[in-house]
C-alpha cells in the first residue's frame, strides 16, 4: 500500500463542525477536498491515507459568500466538501491529523 503525493492534494482538511461531529455517529466523516477532485479519487485517497474501507462518497459544492470588508465588497471562494461513509468497524479520528 503506497501513498501517492497526489492523495495529500485531494484531501485538504477535515471539517470539524457540530453537524459533522453528529454525522460521525453514523460512520461518516466530512472533508474539505480539492475542487477538481472526483469521487473515485476521494475514495482512493481516504482509503490509502487512513487505512480504512470506504462504503460511499457524497460531494457537495458550497458557494462562497459575499462579504463587506472595510467598505468594499469581497467574496469567499467556493469550496467542495466530501461526506465519506465508512464500512462497519472502521473509524477515523480527525482530531489526530495525518
UniProtKB/Swiss-Prot annotation:
It comes from the Bacteria. InterPro entries: Nucleotide-bd_a/b_plait_sf (IPR012677), Ribosomal_uL23-like (IPR013025), Ribosomal_uL23/eL15/eS24_sf (IPR012678), Ribosomal_uL23_CS (IPR001014). One of its GO terms (biological process) is translation. The keyword Cell inner membrane does not apply. Keywords: Ribonucleoprotein, Ribosomal protein, RNA-binding, rRNA-binding. SUPFAM superfamilies: Ribosomal proteins S24e, L23 and L15e. The keyword Metal-binding does not apply. Part of the 50S ribosomal subunit. Contacts protein L29, and trigger factor when it is bound to the ribosome. One of the early assembly proteins it binds 23S rRNA. One of the proteins that surrounds the polypeptide exit tunnel on the outside of the ribosome. Forms the main docking site for trigger factor binding to the ribosome. This is Large ribosomal subunit protein uL23. It comes from Nitrobacter winogradskyi (strain ATCC 25391 / DSM 10237 / CIP 104748 / NCIMB 11846 / Nb-255).
